[in-house]
A protein has these predicted regions:
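Membrane metalloprotein/metal-transporter helix-bundle signature
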Residues: 2-201
Length: 201
């Protein structure tokens, strides 16, 4: 009995022992493209706006989905390449929280937007976050090919989420999407408050 307890304690210590933490760019050891893919799914300040954008596109129908699906990754990649080339991030720290707040509110409101408005939102989101990613990759001394991984992951995620939302026919399902938007807006408001209070660093 004592041996099992000691073995369990040893396993628990091994599993719970803190390792080194990296705040932003993740290295998987599989190359820069996979690092970019993992970056998107591990950075909620990039992941949640993409999900919110896909929810908005899905709520506004197939035409808006198709336009946003191609506009968002292309704008993200182009702005990321420009940010990588410049190496300077001129945007303030609270931009991610503002985009979360705005996109969350638009999702929760469920107002019918023209496909051109959804496309403009996707382009603005791609430019702002793409620039920030490109500048961050350059500042960390990583390869720019990580932007390709981020872009591919954005395309796949946006396609899956927006297609799911477009396929929803029941009124209660749209309410679930709106509730998700309200949670995203709440997270954005929380992050904005945190950033403005100076505790984000």
């Amino acid at each position: 009995m004592r041996r099992r307890w000691l073995a369990g304690l040893a396993v628990a210590l091994f599993v719970l022992w803190p390792g080194s933490a990296q705040a932003h760019l993740v290295t998987t050891g599989l190359g820069p493209v996979y690092d970019g893919i993992s970056h998107l799914f591990l950075s909620f300040d990039d992941l949640l706006p993409v999900v919110a954008m896909a929810l908005i596109a899905g709520l506004n129908g197939p035409a808006a989905c198709r336009r946003a699906l191609f506009t968002l990754p292309v704008a993200w990649l182009a702005a990321g390449a420009a940010g990588y080339a410049s190496g300077v991030a001129p945007l303030p720290a609270g931009v991610a929280s503002v985009s979360l707040l705005l996109l969350g509110i638009l999702t929760a409101a469920d107002r019918k937007l023209a496909p051109s408005v959804v496309t403009a939102l996707a382009m603005a989101l791609g430019i702002v976050h793409g620039w920030s990613n490109g500048a961050g990759i350059a500042a960390a001394g990583r390869e720019g090919r990580g932007l390709i991984g981020i872009t591919v992951a954005i395309f796949v995620l946006a396609a899956l989420v927006s297609a799911l939302v477009v396929s929803l026919r029941r009124p209660w399902a749209r309410i679930v999407v709106r509730v998700a938007g309200s949670w995203i807006a709440a997270i954005g408001l929380l992050l904005l408050g945190w950033t403005l209070s100076g505790r984000s660093r």
